[in-house]
């Protein structure tokens, strides 16, 4: 997100927040990530004005972050995955006070695929569905939040999702919808995280001035394309 934001004339990241025990705390952001100092420093607290929060953190200390966001009352894009139902409900409840956009996956193409899968299954809900996914070996949650969202559309339990964790970069999700007569196979691949960073920044541009409510990628799809 930091790197991609440099390609947007109308977006500036003003706060670079890490937890108080992070190895990046008080280090130069540019030097830490790109080997070139840019005089922007990782901090544990917010020190500059801002319009919207992007949260790509892991679920560790999620309740502390929710408490902070309750105080700030700023629009927030939540991209954290692997949350419990209780944690997700707490995030949804924030929308009573501020705009909240929940997007475990910020790829617009993934959102369009989910919309397509929903329509296909509504047309013929007797078909069987198989979901599989692969991510780099350092990804913590398994199955991915994106795979879980497809499973929810197909009424599949998460134990029915095939998940692989291998390699250093890249990921894919594959959805197969089939019966005895035909099969539809959909696959989305991403070579790195840039597509999700671009997606997050585009979501923020669309979302940060919206009224308090709960928003999803499907909300964005409906607004832009329907």
Per-region residue spans from a language model:
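C-terminal substrate-binding/catalytic lobe of Rossmann-fold NAD(P)-dependent oxidoreductases
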Residues: 1-44, 124-226
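N-terminal Rossmann-like NAD(P) cofactor-binding module of classical short-chain dehydrogenase/reductase
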Residues: 53-54
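Rossmann-fold NAD(P)-binding glycine/threonine-rich loop
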Residues: 60-67, 79-103, 107-120
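Anion (oxyanion) recognition and catalysis
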Residues: 70
């Amino acid at each position: 997100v930091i790197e991609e934001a440099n390609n947007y004339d109308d977006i500036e990241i003003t706060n670079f927040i890490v937890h108080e025990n992070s190895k990046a705390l008080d280090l130069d952001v540019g030097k830490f990530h790109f080997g070139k100092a840019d005089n922007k420093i990782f901090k544990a607290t917010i020190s500059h004005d801002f319009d919207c929060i992007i949260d790509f953190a892991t679920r560790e200390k999620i309740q502390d972050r929710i408490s902070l966001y309750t105080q700030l009352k700023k629009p927030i894009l939540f991209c954290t995955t692997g949350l419990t139902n209780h944690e997700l409900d707490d995030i949804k409840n924030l929308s009573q006070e501020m705009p909240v956009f929940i997007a475990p996956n910020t790829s617009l193409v993934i959102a369009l695929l989910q919309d397509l899968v929903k329509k296909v299954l509504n047309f013929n809900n007797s078909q069987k569905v198989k979901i599989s996914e692969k991510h780099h070996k350092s990804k913590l949650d398994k199955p991915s939040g994106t795979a879980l969202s497809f499973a929810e559309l197909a009424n599949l339990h998460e134990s029915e999702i095939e998940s692989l964790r291998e390699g250093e970069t890249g990921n894919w999700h594959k959805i197969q919808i089939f019966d005895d007569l035909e099969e539809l196979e959909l696959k989305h691949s991403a070579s790195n995280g840039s597509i999700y960073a671009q997606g997050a920044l585009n979501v923020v541009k669309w979302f940060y001035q919206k009224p308090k409510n709960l928003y999803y990628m499907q909300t964005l799809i409906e607004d832009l394309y329907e």
